[in-house]
A protein has these predicted regions:
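N-terminal leader/targeting pre-sequences
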Residues: 4-53, 58-158
Length: 158
């Protein structure tokens, strides 16, 4: 009668974005999202980057059609705050840690972002995820001086 007691709980809702190369880059990859414990879990696997750090943000609009990804608009900012460090209180909801690409141009990220969800007013579904050419300095306004947008993916529910 207790056979199911140790079963892994069913996974909750999730979403993902397939990255499209933009601004002449060769970037590709996938970013996955799930909710757990009131935080948004983000997993990314990216290739085709230059080695080093790259700005990594959720943007307002789920539109990656522009060649430079400008159609994604600015950082998702449901609380109306200034741009800042992803771990700080004063930041855009869409501010995430820089991706670190290895010598082969590959980056992986796994972490939790507070203040965001899959749906609702703080929801990421229907928005976009963008990778930038340069690192986010976590202070310059409005976007961390992270350079051109080299990859963009629309976040869709799985």
């Amino acid at each position: 009668a207790l056979l199911g007691a140790c079963a892994t709980p069913a996974s909750g809702p999730s979403a993902s974005a397939d990255l499209l190369a933009r601004s002449g880059s060769a970037v590709s990859g996938k970013v996955s999202f799930s909710e757990a414990g009131g935080k948004l879990r983000v997993e990314a696997q990216v290739a085709g980057l230059t080695p080093g750090e790259h700005g990594f943000h959720i943007h307002e609009v789920g539109d990656c059609s522009a060649p430079d990804a400008s159609s994604a608009k600015g950082h998702f900012n449901p609380a109306g705050k200034a741009h800042g460090h992803h771990a700080g209180m004063e930041r855009h909801g869409g501010d995430m840690p820089n991706l670190l690409a290895n010598a082969a141009g590959e980056a992986r990220f796994s972490g939790e972002i507070s203040g965001l969800s899959l749906g609702g007013a703080t929801g990421v579904v229907g928005r976009s995820v963008v990778i930038h050419a340069d690192p986010d300095d976590y202070k310059s306004q409005p976007a961390g001086n992270s350079g051109k947008r080299i990859a963009c993916g629309v976040i869709v529910a799985d």
